[in-house]
Structure formats: C-alpha cells, structure tokens
Amino acid sequence: MAKKTYDLLFKLLLIGDSGVGKTCVLFRFSDDAFNTTFISTIGIDFKIKTVELHGKKIKLQIWDTAGQERFHTITTSYYRGAMGIMLVYDITNAKSFENISKWLRNIDEHANEDVERMLLGNKCDMEDKRVVLKSKGEQIAREHAIRFFETSAKANINIEKAFLTLAEDILQKTPVKEPDRENVDISTTGGGTGLKKCCS
C-alpha cells in the first residue's frame, strides 16, 4: 500500500453565481494560470493542491461547482463533506452580490454546522466597472461572522492568501490525531504563523 504523502485532507468548495470567476480563482491557485476562455462548469469539477502549514502537509481537494440553477441538486450534495466553503461574487455584477444571501442559506441547509466559510469579492482588478463597494462585502461578512477578501484571479490578488487563510482556519479547529505515534514532534518549526506554500 502506497504511503500517504500528506498529513491531512481538507475538502473545500467554491460556490456562487455562474460567471463570477470561480473556475479562474481555482486555476490561479492550483496552477498559477489565468485563462479568459473557460466555459461554464458543467455540474462539478475539482483540483488538488498540497500546501504546508505549521509543519503539516495538507492536501486541499477543491471542488468547483456550477452556478446555474439547473445543477443545484447535483452541487448541494457536495456541501455535506466540505470543511471550508468559499462564496464568490463579482464586484462588477450587483446581482451576484445580492444572491450571496441565497448561497448562505444553501450552506445553512446543506453543509455541516461547523463548516468554515469565507466571502470573496472577485474581479477587483476591474475597479472602473465596480458596482459593489468593498464596504458592502465587509458588512455582510461581519453580519455572518466570516472572513472576507477582495480577489482577482487575473491580477493574482489575494488568491493564495484566501486559500491559505481558509486552510489555516480549518487546521486550527482540527483535533490533533495520531496519539499512537510517540515520536511526533508537536512543536511548530520556525515559530510564528508563517504560511508556506508547497508545490503540489
């Protein structure tokens, strides 16, 4: 049997209206790539990326969901096992922001109670086309006690920071396992809270 190359597996989910840039956000993080010609996600897709946090190798299994209503039944079935959910809206599309309340209700109905949530206002590089003020995103994040970032997959703004912060929040509430391994060094190497990227 092959030896595991990671210590922990975190399942993350990207949700939000169609066209807000979920797939672009995912590809920027997983492959450091940006493509303007992505077609709409059909149903659900996922990427894997391994990162290192506090000396632990964490495999992130990131699911990219379709935003269209006709895929609603398929995608909500993936909420249950998610440990972290990113809600994405487009700062140039007011409707996508208004629908965040609907997506939050979906999480309440279908996800685990202790799931970590994060709000992303994407396409922040398009300041000249902005219709959703940053303060609006901050307000809804405060109301629901969740983290908030404005991101740009195109300009690579806050993408890695958002994913690593979400992984960090999940790690903080993950119980330390493996009590049978006496040689485990639980001290954090290097101290501090340095978030280190590791190649997938």
UniProtKB/Swiss-Prot annotation:
Q: What are its GO biological-process terms?
A: axonogenesis; cellular response to insulin stimulus; endoplasmic reticulum tubular network organization; endosomal transport; establishment of neuroblast polarity; establishment of protein localization to endoplasmic reticulum membrane; Golgi to plasma membrane protein transport; Golgi to plasma membrane transport
Q: What is its EC number?
A: 3.6.5.2
Regulation acting on activity, per entry: Regulated by guanine nucleotide exchange factors (GEFs) which promote the exchange of bound GDP for free GTP. Regulated by GTPase activating proteins (GAPs) which increase the GTP hydrolysis activity. Inhibited by GDP dissociation inhibitors (GDIs) which prevent Rab-GDP dissociation.
Binding residues for GTP, per the UniProt record?
A: 18-24, 35-36, 40-41, 67, 122-123, 125-126, 152-154
Which InterPro entries does the entry link to? P-loop_NTPase, Small_GTP-bd, Small_GTPase, Small_GTPase_Rab
Q: Does the keyword Membrane apply?
A: yes
What's its catalytic activity?
GTP + H2O = GDP + phosphate + H(+)
Which residues bind Mg(2+) per the record?
Answer: T23, T41, D64
Report motif location: Switch 2. 64-81
Cellular component GO terms held in the UniProt record: cilium; endoplasmic reticulum membrane; endoplasmic reticulum tubular network; endosome; endosome membrane; Golgi apparatus; insulin-responsive compartment; phagocytic vesicle membrane
| Keyword Nucleotide-binding included in the entry's annotation | yes
- As recorded in UniProt, coiled-coil segments are none
Superkingdom, taxonomy of origin: Eukaryota
A single Gene Ontology molecular function, please? GDP binding
Co-factor(s): Mg(2+)
S-geranylgeranyl cysteine: lipidated positions: C198, C199
**Swiss-Prot/TrEMBL keywords:** Cell projection, Cytoplasmic vesicle, Endoplasmic reticulum, Endosome, Golgi apparatus, GTP-binding, Hydrolase, Lipoprotein, Magnesium, Membrane, Metal-binding, Nucleotide-binding, Prenylation, Protein transport, Transport
Motif Switch 1 covers 32-46
Compartment(s): Cytoplasmic vesicle membrane; Golgi apparatus, trans-Golgi network membrane; Endosome membrane; Recycling endosome membrane
* Protein topology in the membrane: Lipid-anchor
Q: What class of enzyme is it?
A: hydrolase
Span list, region Disordered: 181-200
Question: SMART domains recorded for this chain?
Answer: ARF, RAB, RAN, RAS, RHO
- What's this protein's function? The small GTPases Rab are key regulators of intracellular membrane trafficking, from the formation of transport vesicles to their fusion with membranes. Rabs cycle between an inactive GDP-bound form and an active GTP-bound form that is able to recruit to membranes different set of downstream effectors directly responsible for vesicle formation, movement, tethering and fusion. That Rab is mainly involved in the biosynthetic transport of proteins from the Golgi to the plasma membrane.
Q: Which family does it belong to?
A: Belongs to the small GTPase superfamily. Rab family.
Listed name of the protein: Ras-related protein Rab-10
This protein's species is Diplobatis ommata (Ocellated electric ray)
